A protein has these predicted regions:
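An acidic, glycine-rich surface segment that forms the CoA-thioester-binding/catalytic face
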Residues: 1-27, 67-69, 74, 200-222
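Crotonase-fold acyl-CoA enzyme core
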Residues: 14-131
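Conserved N-terminal Rossmann-fold NAD(P)-binding element of oxidoreductases
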Residues: 229-231
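Amphipathic alpha-helical segments at domain termini/boundaries
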Residues: 36-39, 84-187, 201-220
Length: 279
């Protein structure tokens, strides 16, 4: 569905430009746009069991409401790239260490009120987009960018979203905030219009719909004791090893005895090596 007004990037900018301090009180899961709203706030307080993350990469997208520009200013280049390219959430305690949240709470509402009173007495309040401390070490940031660029190439190959995230984070260093936000938005639109995001979004919803099929949800899983693997090459041997380690009997099928023996020898060699290592 096309986005409806007010658009989230504009909401985040409005929050950041309010002349009174804004404290985001987080609990449960603060993911995607929810976390981007919190990043646009002046302060963040989180319940101790809160999970925080920007999982858009799993849909072939990037955080499009300031996440690629604000998170590096709080957590630093390396940590921000790790969070956004992995799509995995972090704990509240990890977020506190990184500087993503300012305080952890066991009684969120009361602690948030007390925190609000405390910061209200200050004359100035930090705008996330204006923070530059994490950008001071040019050499360290260049190393982080270069290292992540190599890792993204090795790990993600032809996937576009991780590369675009890296480009946006580079923009957060080299551009002012308004230019960086514009660059992020254009990059988001490019990914949204691309084939990869459409395919990953389709897969995301298809997986959830499949779990709701009555015949599937009511069915009892069959007890599997034997597995047949077609092919004894690298992939077939790997599947065979995993199945044997799980206690299953395996029948390996190959086109001739020569290839079958090679496959069996490969599996045997790996298992013997694991035994020698005490695995």
């Amino acid at each position: 569905q096309p986005p409806q007004e007010p658009h989230l990037p504009e909401v985040c900018e409005e929050i950041e430009n309010i002349d009174k301090p804004v404290i985001a009180a987080l609990h449960g899961t603060a993911l995607g746009g929810g976390l981007e709203i919190a990043l646009a706030s002046n302060y963040r307080i989180a319940e101790e069991k809160t999970k925080l993350g920007l999982p858009e990469v799993n849909l072939g997208l990037l955080p499009g409401a300031g996440g690629t520009q604000r998170l590096p200013r709080l957590a630093g280049i390396s940590a921000a790239l790790q969070i956004m390219t992995s799509g995995k959430p972090i704990s509240a305690s990890e977020a506190l260490k990184l500087g993503v949240v300012d305080k952890i709470s066991t009684n969120l509402l009361e602690d948030a009120k007390a925190f609000a009173k405390q910061v209200a007495e200050k004359n100035s309040h930090p705008k996330t987009s204006m923070l530059t401390e994490k950008f001071d070490n040019d050499e360290l940031n260049k190393e982080a960018i270069a290292s992540m660029k190599e890792l993204i190439q090795q790990k993600f190959g032809a996937l576009e979203a991780p590369k675009k995230i890296l480009e946006c984070v580079e923009a957060s260093i080299s551009m002012d905030i308004s230019e960086g936000l514009k660059y992020e938005r254009n990059s988001f639109s490019e990914l949204m219009a691309g084939k990869q995001s459409k395919a990953l979004i389709h897969a995301f919803f298809a997986e959830r719909k499949s779990a709701k099929i009555p015949e599937v949800s009511r069915a009892n899983a069959r007890d599997i004791k034997t597995l047949s693997v077609i092919g004894g090459g690298t992939m077939g041997a790997g599947i065979t090893i995993a199945a044997l380690n799980a206690g299953l009997k395996v029948k390996m099928i190959e086109q001739d005895n020569e290839n079958l023996n090679k496959g069996i020898q490969h599996v045997t060699k790996v298992l013997e090596r694991d035994v020698d290592k005490g695995r």
